[in-house]
Structures are given as C-alpha cells and as structure tokens.
Amino acid sequence: MSAYPKFDVILKALNLSSVGVIITDPEQKNNPIIFVNTGFENITGYTKEEAIGSNCHFLQGDDTDKEEVAKIRHAINEKSTANVLLKNYRKNGTSFMNELTIEPIYDDNDHLYFVGIQKDVTTEHNYQLELEKSLWEIEKLSTPIVPIKENICVLPLIGSLTHDRFQHMSDYVSEYMDNGKEDYLIMDLSGLADFNEDAVMNLVKFHGFMKLTGVELIITGISPKFAMTLMRYQENLSSLTTYSTIKEALQFY
C-alpha cells in the first residue's frame, strides 16, 4: 500500500482550503495558469475554465503596485520564491488585497512549475490603514500647532522628544506649512521632560529643515540646563532666535 495519498485526495484537500492555489507553467509561452482550486474561484469570482490558460495579469489593475509585480517577475526569472502584497480585482470589478506567495516546484522530469498561494487580506489591510490613520491623528494631537497671528503659529512640546516623535512632528509640521502662510514658527520647549543629546541633534535637524521651507524657527522656554546642552552645538544653531517665553517672543513679531 502506498504511503502517499492519491491524487484525488490531494485535489480534494486543495479545494477544501479557503486560500487560493494556482499553478503556472513558466516553460510555456506567457507562463499560463494550468490549475486553480476552489479557493481561487471563491476569492476572485473567476471559474477555473476562465482562469486556466491565462496569465495572472488579468487580476491586476492600473493601480496595482508595479514594484510588487516586478518582484514576482524577478522571482520567476530567478526560479526563486517571492512574497508580495498586491491590489487585485475580482471578476465583478471590486478590488481586494492579495497576499501572494509563489514557489518554484519541479516534477519527476525536472519540469519547472510555480505554485501561488493567495490570501484575501483586505480586512486586515484596511484595519492597518485605519490604525495608522488613528495613530497619525493621535500624533497630531500630541503635536498641536496653534495659530497666534496671521503669520505666526506656536508649537508647544510636552513630554519627551524621542526620535519617532521627532519624525512624526517633522512630517506633521511639513504638511501644516504646505497648507499655511506662516512666516514664523515658535517652538516652546518649557514642557519638555528632558533635553538630551539626541533631542538637541533633532532640534539641529529641524532648524535646518525649517530654513529650507522659508519659515523662521523661534525657540522659547529654554531652561538653564537646556541652554548648557545647546552651547555645544552653537555652530549649528548660531542663527537660531531664542526667547525666554512665548509672550516675550510675540513682542518682537
């Protein structure tokens, strides 16, 4: 008795799977599909009769990520594995996010095939986008830009200026300035919990970034401890305008 399951058992198992399974033959012209399982039909809406003989390109649209498609092409050329996330389209025209893995396999005659395992991760992808959007909104709330006058706004910093927070802050300020007409940005540091070397380096970078935008950066709320740390970077911050308080700064602008 054979230790291996019969072909019809394997086929039945494949068709019971909820993931899509396709097999293509890259040794034929245009690498056509030669097998799809029921999972593929359920995900895409295409029947096996419609899919077999076609290249997988028919699932793509104009907004399918070209870089991800290039990874697939490279893997096929190199006879290697690829893992990609593609925006694909069902037969009814609706889109879905396809988490696709392709693997080269050989039969007993060393004939090359590619097996593709596809999973509809649209729900997970949309959740991730919503999560990122929510985190961005939270970050905006933790980095409030307050308009004071027609051409002046204030950015009060509270807590710690970590690398990640600095990056989010830079992105948010850049977006804000692109849509505004401010000439001056007052950054108030009086609420910062600490001001270490990393925070100073981030401030140096931010100062350079603001100079490129044409918006003058004004720093207020510098404690004596902060001032001592800043002294070591005087060359980089020599053109930086500072005041004790926001109120004092506004007297000059």
From Swiss-Prot:
It comes from the Bacteria. Residues 80-133 form the PAC domain. Exhibits the same spectroscopical features and blue-light induced photochemistry as plants phototropins, with the reversible formation of a blue-shifted photoproduct, assigned to an FMN-cysteine thiol adduct. Positive regulator in the activation of the general stress transcription factor sigma-B. FMN binds covalently to cysteine after exposure to blue light and this bond is spontaneously broken in the dark. InterPro entries: Bact_StressResp_Reg, PAC, PAS, PAS-assoc_C, PAS-like_dom_sf, STAS_dom, STAS_dom_sf. NCBIfam families: sensory_box. SUPFAM superfamilies: PYP-like sensor domain (PAS domain), SpoIIaa-like. Residues 6-79 form the PAS domain. The keyword Transport does not apply. Residues 142-253 form the STAS domain. It holds the Pfam family STAS. The modification S-4a-FMN cysteine is found at residue 56. The keyword Flavoprotein applies. It comes from Listeria innocua serovar 6a (strain ATCC BAA-680 / CLIP 11262). This is Blue-light photoreceptor. Keywords: Chromophore, Flavoprotein, FMN, Photoreceptor protein, Receptor, Sensory transduction, Transcription, Transcription regulation. One of its GO terms (molecular function) is photoreceptor activity. The lineage of its organism: Bacteria, Bacillati, Bacillota, Bacilli, Bacillales. PROSITE patterns: PAC, PAS, STAS.
